[in-house]
Amino acid sequence: MIDQLTASFQRSEKLQKHVRFLYSKGSLYKVFNGNLLFHGCVPMTEDGQLLTFTLGGKARSGKEFFDFADTAARQAYYHKPGSPERQQGMDFLWFLWAGRNSPIFGRNRMTTFERRLIKDESAWTEPKNAYYTYYQDPAVCDDLLKEFGLEGPHCHIINGHIPVKSKKGESPIKGGGKLLVIDGGFCKAYQQTTGIAGYTLIYNSACYRLVSHEPFVGRAEAIRTSQDIASTSVVFERLESRLKIAGTDVG
């Protein structure tokens, strides 16, 4: 059965096209126009320091760890099938998916089976990395930005992964405006938790704008009431002067 599942994944034209796109265009993080974008977290210790991993015979943390992880993930795809490098990359991909202190997963454990098989909700907890506590501190956000070569009043960390519980009053703006959590809240499964359908970040030459979306009411109701997806837009940061092409990374 495992062989059949493997063959189905390997022979799926659409899936393989998508994977090729991710590897050719994607990366574990991106620095762009003064912003640091990544999905999960920069792993930290409980006392607020960058978590150190010993990999390839060397201690690595922060940006150096991210660069190593990005290279290892590519080994899993580009190296020759059956080679030690490919197997090492595949093992590292498994860690990135659900491993403790993974920069993509950002939790200590995954409790998918517990949620399905155990009624006691205390068994479902997935403790988050300390990063999700410290990212409320503007000084920590500034230190993380410096780690990736960014410094200035309009530099930001743009984060995903963790749904923002808007219905409980949680804001996507963290760290005194230095960090933004833009999670894919359009996913219907999360809307009971968040209370909305996620956020869109709009960035132009004049400002940063956050747009929050209300859940889609359904096709029949939308036609009956002539109602599309309702959105609320808020400008949360303005630039002192318009950003010109010369001030961007790639124009």
Regions found by a protein language model. Name each.
Residues M1-G251:
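Feature recognizes metal-dependent phosphohydrolase scaffolds
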